[in-house]
Protein backbone atom coordinates (compact mmCIF):
# COMPACT_ATOMS: atom_id res chain seq x y z
CA UNK A 1 0.00 0.00 0.00
CA UNK A 2 2.86 2.40 0.73
CA UNK A 3 4.27 1.87 -2.72
CA UNK A 4 1.06 3.13 -4.33
CA UNK A 5 0.99 6.27 -2.19
CA UNK A 6 4.60 7.08 -3.09
CA UNK A 7 4.25 6.20 -6.75
CA UNK A 8 1.19 8.34 -7.38
CA UNK A 9 2.77 11.67 -6.28
CA UNK A 10 5.95 10.86 -8.21
CA UNK A 11 3.94 10.06 -11.34
CA UNK A 12 1.94 13.29 -11.00
CA UNK A 13 5.11 15.34 -10.54
CA UNK A 14 6.69 13.80 -13.64
CA UNK A 15 3.60 14.43 -15.77
CA UNK A 16 3.41 18.04 -14.64
CA UNK A 17 7.10 18.63 -15.32
CA UNK A 18 6.87 17.07 -18.81
CA UNK A 19 3.88 19.23 -19.77
CA UNK A 20 5.58 22.31 -18.32
CA UNK A 21 8.74 21.56 -20.32
CA UNK A 22 6.77 21.24 -23.57
CA UNK A 23 4.99 24.55 -22.94
CA UNK A 24 8.27 26.25 -22.08
CA UNK A 25 10.06 25.40 -25.35
CA UNK A 26 8.11 28.12 -27.18
CA UNK A 27 9.17 30.61 -24.50
CA UNK A 28 12.74 30.19 -25.75
CA UNK A 29 12.18 30.85 -29.46
CA UNK A 30 15.25 32.33 -31.13
CA UNK A 31 17.13 32.93 -27.87
CA UNK A 32 20.27 32.27 -29.92
CA UNK A 33 20.41 33.60 -33.47
CA UNK A 34 20.78 30.45 -35.61
CA UNK A 35 20.26 32.10 -39.02
CA UNK A 36 22.85 32.41 -41.74
CA UNK A 37 24.09 31.19 -45.08
CA UNK A 38 27.86 30.72 -45.14
CA UNK A 39 29.59 31.39 -48.44
CA UNK A 40 33.01 30.22 -47.28
CA UNK A 41 34.26 27.06 -45.58
CA UNK A 42 35.78 29.24 -42.86
CA UNK A 43 33.47 32.23 -42.44
CA UNK A 44 34.72 34.62 -39.71
CA UNK A 45 33.62 37.96 -38.30
CA UNK A 46 35.80 41.06 -37.73
CA UNK A 47 37.32 39.51 -34.58
CA UNK A 48 38.16 36.10 -36.14
CA UNK A 49 35.17 34.38 -34.52
CA UNK A 50 32.53 32.41 -36.39
CA UNK A 51 29.93 34.66 -38.02
CA UNK A 52 27.19 32.09 -37.45
CA UNK A 53 25.91 30.04 -34.51
CA UNK A 54 24.96 26.59 -35.84
CA UNK A 55 22.63 24.33 -33.90
CA UNK A 56 24.52 21.36 -32.41
CA UNK A 57 22.87 18.89 -30.04
CA UNK A 58 23.57 15.61 -28.21
CA UNK A 59 27.33 16.07 -28.59
CA UNK A 60 27.19 16.03 -32.39
CA UNK A 61 30.19 17.14 -34.43
CA UNK A 62 27.96 18.57 -37.16
CA UNK A 63 25.40 21.35 -36.98
CA UNK A 64 22.84 23.28 -38.99
CA UNK A 65 21.59 26.83 -39.46
CA UNK A 66 18.21 28.39 -40.18
CA UNK A 67 17.68 30.04 -43.57
CA UNK A 68 18.35 33.77 -43.69
CA UNK A 69 15.92 34.56 -46.50
CA UNK A 70 14.22 33.41 -49.71
CA UNK A 71 17.39 32.01 -51.32
CA UNK A 72 18.00 29.57 -48.49
CA UNK A 73 14.47 28.70 -47.37
CA UNK A 74 13.49 25.07 -47.76
CA UNK A 75 16.87 23.95 -46.43
CA UNK A 76 18.98 24.19 -43.33
CA UNK A 77 22.19 25.99 -44.35
CA UNK A 78 25.53 24.69 -43.22
CA UNK A 79 26.29 21.84 -42.70
CA UNK A 80 28.79 22.96 -40.06
CA UNK A 81 31.48 20.43 -39.24
CA UNK A 82 33.62 20.52 -36.11
CA UNK A 83 37.14 19.76 -37.24
CA UNK A 84 39.17 19.60 -34.05
CA UNK A 85 38.38 22.94 -32.40
CA UNK A 86 37.27 24.84 -35.53
CA UNK A 87 34.05 24.97 -37.50
CA UNK A 88 34.16 24.42 -41.24
CA UNK A 89 31.07 24.80 -43.38
CA UNK A 90 30.34 22.29 -46.10
CA UNK A 91 27.57 23.99 -48.08
CA UNK A 92 25.42 27.06 -48.15
CA UNK A 93 22.57 24.61 -48.77
CA UNK A 94 23.40 20.93 -48.76
CA UNK A 95 19.82 19.88 -49.43
CA UNK A 96 17.05 22.39 -50.07
CA UNK A 97 13.45 21.65 -50.95
CA UNK A 98 11.76 23.51 -53.78
CA UNK A 99 8.07 22.90 -54.43
CA UNK A 100 6.42 23.18 -57.84
CA UNK A 101 2.69 23.18 -58.55
CA UNK A 102 1.14 23.22 -62.03
CA UNK A 103 4.61 23.76 -63.53
CA UNK A 104 5.32 26.89 -61.45
CA UNK A 105 7.56 27.32 -58.44
CA UNK A 106 5.44 27.87 -55.33
CA UNK A 107 6.04 31.32 -53.81
CA UNK A 108 6.23 30.74 -50.06
CA UNK A 109 6.41 33.05 -47.10
CA UNK A 110 8.94 31.89 -44.54
CA UNK A 111 8.74 31.58 -40.78
CA UNK A 112 11.92 30.10 -39.32
CA UNK A 113 12.87 29.78 -35.67
CA UNK A 114 14.87 27.77 -33.20
CA UNK A 115 13.59 26.25 -29.99
CA UNK A 116 15.50 24.11 -27.51
CA UNK A 117 16.28 20.86 -29.32
CA UNK A 118 15.05 21.81 -32.80
CA UNK A 119 15.14 24.12 -35.81
CA UNK A 120 11.75 24.79 -37.41
CA UNK A 121 10.70 26.20 -40.79
CA UNK A 122 7.14 26.90 -41.86
CA UNK A 123 6.63 27.67 -45.54
CA UNK A 124 3.18 28.98 -46.40
CA UNK A 125 1.48 29.67 -49.73
CA UNK A 126 -2.18 29.86 -50.76
CA UNK A 127 -2.72 26.13 -51.34
CA UNK A 128 0.45 24.61 -49.89
CA UNK A 129 1.94 24.40 -46.41
CA UNK A 130 5.29 22.85 -45.55
CA UNK A 131 6.54 22.38 -42.00
CA UNK A 132 10.10 21.19 -41.52
CA UNK A 133 11.55 20.29 -38.12
CA UNK A 134 15.20 19.32 -37.74
CA UNK A 135 16.32 17.49 -34.59
CA UNK A 136 19.26 15.36 -33.56
CA UNK A 137 18.40 11.69 -33.02
CA UNK A 138 21.92 10.68 -31.98
CA UNK A 139 25.30 12.42 -31.81
CA UNK A 140 25.88 11.31 -35.41
CA UNK A 141 22.41 11.67 -36.87
CA UNK A 142 20.21 14.70 -37.46
CA UNK A 143 16.72 13.97 -38.75
CA UNK A 144 14.45 16.20 -40.78
CA UNK A 145 10.71 15.72 -40.45
CA UNK A 146 8.83 17.31 -43.34
CA UNK A 147 5.03 17.66 -43.40
CA UNK A 148 3.49 18.86 -46.66
CA UNK A 149 -0.19 19.77 -46.97
CA UNK A 150 -1.81 20.39 -50.35
CA UNK A 151 -5.01 19.50 -52.19
CA UNK A 152 -3.24 19.39 -55.56
CA UNK A 153 -0.34 17.29 -56.87
CA UNK A 154 3.11 18.76 -56.28
CA UNK A 155 6.57 18.26 -57.71
CA UNK A 156 9.25 18.19 -55.01
CA UNK A 157 12.84 18.98 -55.99
CA UNK A 158 15.84 18.68 -53.67
CA UNK A 159 19.01 20.52 -54.62
CA UNK A 160 22.23 21.67 -53.03
CA UNK A 161 25.76 22.76 -53.73
CA UNK A 162 29.05 22.38 -51.88
CA UNK A 163 31.07 25.46 -51.00
CA UNK A 164 34.17 26.10 -53.09
CA UNK A 165 35.64 29.21 -51.44
CA UNK A 166 37.99 28.63 -48.50
CA UNK A 167 38.11 31.57 -46.11
CA UNK A 168 36.62 35.02 -45.48
CA UNK A 169 36.49 37.70 -42.83
CA UNK A 170 33.28 39.77 -42.68
CA UNK A 171 32.29 38.25 -46.03
CA UNK A 172 35.49 39.36 -47.78
CA UNK A 173 37.80 36.62 -49.11
CA UNK A 174 41.21 36.27 -47.45
CA UNK A 175 42.64 34.36 -50.39
CA UNK A 176 41.68 33.06 -53.81
CA UNK A 177 42.13 29.44 -52.69
CA UNK A 178 39.32 26.99 -53.29
Ranges and model annotations:
Residues 1-10:
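Bacterial N-terminal signal peptides that target proteins for export
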Residues 3, 19-22:
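Extended, charged low-complexity regulatory segments
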Residues 9-17:
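Bacterial N-terminal signal peptides
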Amino acid sequence: MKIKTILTPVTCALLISFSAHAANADNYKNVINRTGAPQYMKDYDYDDHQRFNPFFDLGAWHGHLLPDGPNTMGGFPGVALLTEEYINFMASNFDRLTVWQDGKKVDFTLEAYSIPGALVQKLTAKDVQVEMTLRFATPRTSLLETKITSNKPLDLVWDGELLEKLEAKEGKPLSDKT
